[in-house]
A protein has these predicted regions:
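Basic, alpha-helical interaction scaffolds
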Residues: 178, 239-316, 372, 380
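Mobile genetic element proteins and their domesticated derivatives, centered on retroelements
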Residues: 5, 17, 21, 25, ...
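Short, conserved micro-motifs composed of acidic
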Residues: 107-110, 211-246, 267
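Conserved, non-catalytic sequence blocks in retroelement Pol enzymes and Pol-derived host proteins
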Residues: 9-14, 38-47, 60-63, 76-80, ...
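Family-specific functional microsites
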Residues: 282, 286-289, 441-446, 450-564
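Conserved pre-catalytic core of RNA-dependent polymerases
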Residues: 1-151
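Catalytic palm active-site di-aspartate
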Residues: 5, 37, 68-79, 133-137, ...
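Extended C-terminal regions of large enzymes
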Residues: 299-301, 325-330, 339-486, 490, ...
């Protein structure tokens, strides 16, 4: 039972009451909270804290900053242990004087008596009154918890102590996401001071951090970043020594003391393989007709790209080789969708489907996050952190990467501020597609003789992609010279003759000349329009017939040889 968790399913009346009170008080609460806790707050995201953490690690690893300790804490059963009186007192201290009224009293009164029943596999228990609780799953639960934990950040801010100075200037408070807490301090006395402060403040709220269980596992860890010191302090959590690790999971990402992205990428690659399997299962089980490619691309965007690129836009020092790992996995998905071999020219997927490579998607997301940063209030901790990094970059800083992105897309930094979110999104999308098209055409001209007959004017999905699955696959193979002809896979070997008539080379161009195929082919038209933007229905039928006839005759000849 110790690991069982649940949320409160509230009555409709209680939900409506909570929402009405929440709408009246939220803006006042949010405006008076510090930048320490981002949980349950609008227009704030886990990316904000990760962006700061990665930036500080990079400034230590690649800059001249002193070694630091990252102190990662998790509060044990936080919502179960929260004290309603303490949470409402914290809300009272947070809101302005004009909201010191009956609304706060109404929140308190509505949570004093809670008739709770537990739903389990065998039914439901009888209802018992559990007084004065913070309801996890209710409207007020997350913001009450975030505001209560935010008092730690406020005390650091107001007392001007237990914060980290980024590049000696920007004050970084302890970073929290509801009940997940990350403290940053220079290794030494400052680290001990922060550790003592956080532990004491949590105990004063009648809460506890996780301590090692009977198996020695704990959710509270210390990551040392930078050169090791002889007097690197031992930190404690409620009297128990804090475990020191090389990396730890925080807000969904793996934070590594060496500042590298390798473990995050390995984790996302593994996740991506599972997502590809799920996508292909869906596509193969359901008959989608002419919507096959459209739905496949929607699944690629929503499940695959969003699944593997979570937070990737704020990673520091992301190398091209690391991006290529993602693109390799992406092409694996596209290969399975189009049923083509590994040797298919990689630029052909994007030019034929009208989609963007993963690397350019990351660039787009980086610029969108840059737009978010530039439009923050100048008093915001995150904005000050960003401006310091923009003006005083360290090798490997995020701002160096995004400067290159702006240059690639032809967007000026000083024009970002003031642009609407909708406008910048459209501008980035337009410029990204132009940039991607130019890069893909360079690859086509440089690397791929197979695509020599194909002409493109812009990056868009080819019209034949609205055909059925079988037609799309066969046309794509013919256009990219990946159909099952010997000359398409010669790779330096001697010429291949047609296995059916042995009178000409076994290639796509000569397939209509084959006597064996001509005897069974109903249509005699030219199929040169296969390389154009408008492919006729007759050409599609001829291609399907050629593939079908070749397969049948080759299988027949193979069977005859075995029988003989």
């Amino acid at each position: 039972m110790n690991n069982d968790r649940g949320i409160f399913i509230l009555t409709v009346f209680k939900k409506i009451l909570d929402k009405l009170l929440y709408f009246d008080l939220y803006d006042d609460i949010d405006s008076n909270m510090s930048a320490s806790n981002i949980g349950a707050r609008k227009k704030r995201n886990i990316k904000n804290h990760l962006f700061i953490i990665y930036g500080i690690i990079n400034s230590v690893v690649n800059g001249k900053e002193d070694p630091i300790d990252l102190q990662i804490y998790d509060i044990e059963k936080c919502f179960d242990a929260l004290w309603l009186d303490d949470c409402l007192n914290d809300i009272y201290d947070t809101v302005s004087a004009e909201n010191h009224n009956d609304k706060l009293a109404l929140i308190y009164e509505s949570n004093q008596e809670n008739l709770v029943a537990i739903r389990h596999p065998l039914g439901m228990t009888t209802r018992e009154n559990i007084p004065n609780i913070v309801q996890q799953g209710g409207t007020w639960g997350p913001i009450l918890c975030s505001n209560s934990i935010d008092t730690l950040g406020k005390k650091c801010r107001d007392r001007k102590e237990n914060f980290y100075l980024y590049k000696g200037v920007v004050k970084i408070l302890p970073l929290a996401m509801v009940d997940d807490l990350n403290g940053i301090a220079k290794c030494g006395i400052q680290s001990i001071s922060l550790n003592t402060f956080l532990t004491t403040q949590i105990e004063m709220k009648k809460l506890r951090f996780h301590v090692p269980d009977e198996k020695g596992k704990t959710k509270c860890h210390k990551i040392h970043v930078g050169s090791q010191r002889e007097l690197c302090p031992i930190l404690k959590v409620h009297g128990t020594e804090m475990e020191m690790v090389e990396d730890d999971t925080y807000l969904g990402d793996i934070i590594s003391g060496d500042g590298k992205n390798s473990k995050n990428i390995q984790k996302r690659i593994s996740k991506g393989i599972g997502i590809i399997s799920s996508i292909m299962t869906l596509l193969n089980k359901i008959c989608l007709g002419e919507f096959y490619i459209e739905i496949a691309m929607i699944l690629r965007e929503s499940m695959f790209i969003n699944g593997i690129l979570t937070n990737a836009e704020i990673w520091y020092n992301l190398k091209q080789s690391e991006i290529e790992e993602f693109e390799l996995l992406d092409r694996s998905l596209l290969r399975q969708i189009l049923q083509v071999p590994l040797t298919t020219p990689k630029e052909s997927y994007y030019l034929e489907l009208g989609i963007l490579p993963i690397g350019i998607v990351i660039k787009m997301r980086r610029i969108r996050y840059l737009h978010y940063l530039t439009n923050l209030k100048e008093t915001e901790m995150l904005h000050q952190f960003f401006i310091m990094q923009w003006n005083n970059p360290t090798k490997g800083d995020w701002t160096q990467s995004v400067r290159e992105d702006l240059n690639d897309f032809g967007i000026k930094f000083n024009e970002l501020k003031g642009m609407s979110k909708r406008f910048i999104k459209k501008l980035i999308k337009k410029n990204a597609r132009e940039y991607a098209f130019n890069k893909l055409m360079e690859m086509k001209e440089k690397n791929s003789s197979k695509l020599g007959q194909l002409k493109y004017k812009k990056l868009k999905r080819q019209t034949y992609m609205k055909q059925t699955k079988k037609n799309i696959i066969n046309i794509f193979k013919f256009r990219t010279r990946m159909a099952d002809f010997g000359e398409n896979y010669r790779a330096g070997y001697d010429a291949f003759l047609c296995p059916l008539c042995l009178e000409h080379l076994d290639n796509q161009q000569s397939s209509l000349k084959c006597k064996s195929i001509q005897d069974e082919l109903k249509f005699k038209n030219d199929i040169s329009d296969i390389y154009s933007n408008e492919i006729t229905d007759e050409t599609i039928q001829i291609i399907n017939s050629i593939i079908k006839i070749r397969k049948k005759l080759i299988e027949r000849d193979s069977t005859a040889e075995v029988t003989f």
